[in-house]
Amino acid sequence: MNQYLAITSRGLENLLAEELEQLGAQSIQVVHAGVRFKADQSTAYRCCLWTRISSRIIQVLSEFTVRDDMDLYLGAAAINWTEYFSNATRIVVDFNGTNREIRNSQYGAMKVKDAIVDRFTKADLRRPNIDREQPDLRIHMRLSGEKGVLGLDMAGSGLHQRGYRTEAGRAPLRETHAAALVLKSGWTPGQPLLDPMCGSGTLLIEAAMMAADIAPGLKRKRWGFESIKDFDKDAWLEIHAEASVKARRGPAKVQTKFFGFELEHRILAIARDNAGRAGVKELINFQQGDATELKAPEGFDAGIVICNPPYGERLGTTPELISLYTELGNRLKLAFAGSSASIYSGSNELLSCLRMRADKQFKLPNGALDCVLKTYLITAGSVKKEEGEAEGHVEQENVAPDFANRLKKNITKLNKWAKKEGIDCYRIYDADLPNYNAAIDKYNDYLIIQEYAAPKTVPEEIARRRIMDVLRATIEVTGVQTDKVILKVRERQKGKNQYQKLSNAERHIIVNEYGVDLKVNLYDYLDTGLFLDHRITRKMLGDMAKGKDFLNLFAYTGSASVHAACGGAKSTTTIDMSNTYLGWAQENMELNNQVGDQHEFIQADCLQWLQEVDDTFDLIFIDPPTFSNSKRMKQTFDIQRDHIMLMENLKRMLRTDGKIVFSNNKRQFKMDLEKLNELGLDAKNISDKTLPMDFAKNKHIHNSWIITHKED
């Protein structure tokens, strides 16, 4: 008997061991991400053909210590490779793992290849050809610490390649992984099986192949073991013929009902084609359907619902996924009492949105992603009908009740105020409760939830659960559609980090602020193009601007310039270093019919521009960053260190009766009044007057000043 190593994913070792035992393997030993066993040739062929879970089966030729590249070379060279394959065989070396001395898998593969080639040349034989694209035989080397295992890949390519899937849907599961999920779900042939988000059908196809007794490797055209010298062709043909007979007869015996639902016609067509190639098309009832409107089909009694819903590696997809999982949970409880569900996801937080208690759970990584399969027994008690309620009402769980109650109170108070003020966008929650450290801003009928990064003392799992609770409760309290809820994560703002781009969605909406229309981008940046805490400051500038020449420095998207123009400014000059934001500022002006040569837009480093220009203005607004070391600026800037230098330049540009409105976001900013006095300037702190009601609890979000020439 030969020694073999069957490779699988972490968490599936015991399941694979059971499968191999049923196939006749002996001396079975579970190891990390694999199973060792012994078998004769016929049993090894049968394992390759019939395994549904293993990704590769390696015939182990040698195990040896690998401290460095010399150990690796000598260990590989000790094998008499000419006994296993001829020099006409096209080979490739797959190298998995590293250690302190061998840090590169390509280098490791090269050393093994050199040892193999040298073994042939020392025997006066032509060296075998290396073929990375279509090798006849793959040499497999695994390195873990100082332990090396070297052998021959019996399959040649991954055993997940069943031959039926030429196209896949979004984020497809490997066939071996899908088969394992079906087996872990507790499903047995004879039970109805339904996938409400079937995609390209892999879960259902794997289950149907089990029910029909179709060998998963039956459609493979090439096998690595066919190129090994001791290949027993007669034994293989007998095993393959036996499996072929079972595949022809099996489907007709199947009584199990399989149901697959998919929203997209194109993906559904792929699923049907895949099932056809697998030989199980007639066994699966594929239908177009929405998982959030799922109903139990006729004949689905005491079955299993299995699915792998999306779980969003991109954070911005989370609000819509919360709704998806919540509605899926509702449908399961409403329509599938007496059945069970197995849901596979990479997010425990999203699984909690099902609002169902898991009966079992299995940690089953999907590649590099940590995922879990949870199974649920769906009982009639999951659904509660109150007097006067519609049939099939699902009792709702109270999510984050303290947060939800605070949000309700805030909304009741702020909605009335905002309507009276005449504003479309405002903050409805600002980290009011320490356990729910987020800000929520309303932009028309959109919501932006900004999660402040949790302190290091808060475990990541708890922080993730809390923001998930914020999302769920916000959606429930406000009733806002999930595609209009945007989640962002940010540090507490230190200066303005609006220039950090998050995506390229380029989705804009128009909001109104005191009669002024402004364009905002809710998706692409941490900030939207409009700082809500400066709302009163902008209105004040509009009230002050009539007949005046107005200068806006560090202008961002020019919203202050628009207010000034709409307030009757004689001219506006808008300066920012970013062409993108200057273009945005021009669009904002055009939205309000403020066009003409009196409105100038200049791309420049504001600090340098101040030193070079002699123009004067009646009204100047400057809201500089707290700190900047932009590559496009010639020098660093610190608002505390440099504000007097800034005022010295601004004084030169300020007309006799002019005013500077100066603001910044440094929480501990201290105006140097003594040096300001030496410059001949007066400063009046107006921070309390510019703090809007929706930011009243965050008194240090900005500080604002009016600065004028000292009276003689």
Swiss-Prot record:
Enzyme class: transferase
Protein keywords: Cytoplasm, Methyltransferase, RNA-binding, rRNA processing, S-adenosyl-L-methionine, Transferase
GO function terms (MF aspect): 23S rRNA (guanine(2445)-N(2))-methyltransferase activity; RNA binding; rRNA (guanine-N7-)-methyltransferase activity
Compartments in which it is found: Cytoplasm
Entry EC number(s): 2.1.1.173, 2.1.1.264
CDD domains per UniProt: AdoMet_MTases (cd02440), THUMP_AdoMetMT (cd11715)
Domain (THUMP): residue spans on this chain: 43-154
rRNA processing keyword on record: yes
Keyword Metal-binding: no
Catalyses which reaction(s): guanosine(2445) in 23S rRNA + S-adenosyl-L-methionine = N(2)-methylguanosine(2445) in 23S rRNA + S-adenosyl-L-homocysteine + H(+); guanosine(2069) in 23S rRNA + S-adenosyl-L-methionine = N(2)-methylguanosine(2069) in 23S rRNA + S-adenosyl-L-homocysteine + H(+)
A GO cellular-component term linked to this record: cytoplasm
SMART domains per UniProt: THUMP
Record PROSITE patterns: THUMP (PS51165), UPF0020 (PS01261)
Function: Specifically methylates the guanine in position 2445 (m2G2445) and the guanine in position 2069 (m7G2069) of 23S rRNA.
Family the entry assigns: Belongs to the methyltransferase superfamily. RlmKL family.
PANTHER family: RIBOSOMAL RNA LARGE SUBUNIT METHYLTRANSFERASE K/L, RIBOSOMAL RNA LARGE SUBUNIT METHYLTRANSFERASE K_L
Stated name of the protein: Ribosomal RNA large subunit methyltransferase K/L
Organism, as annotated: Photobacterium profundum (strain SS9)
Gene: rlmL
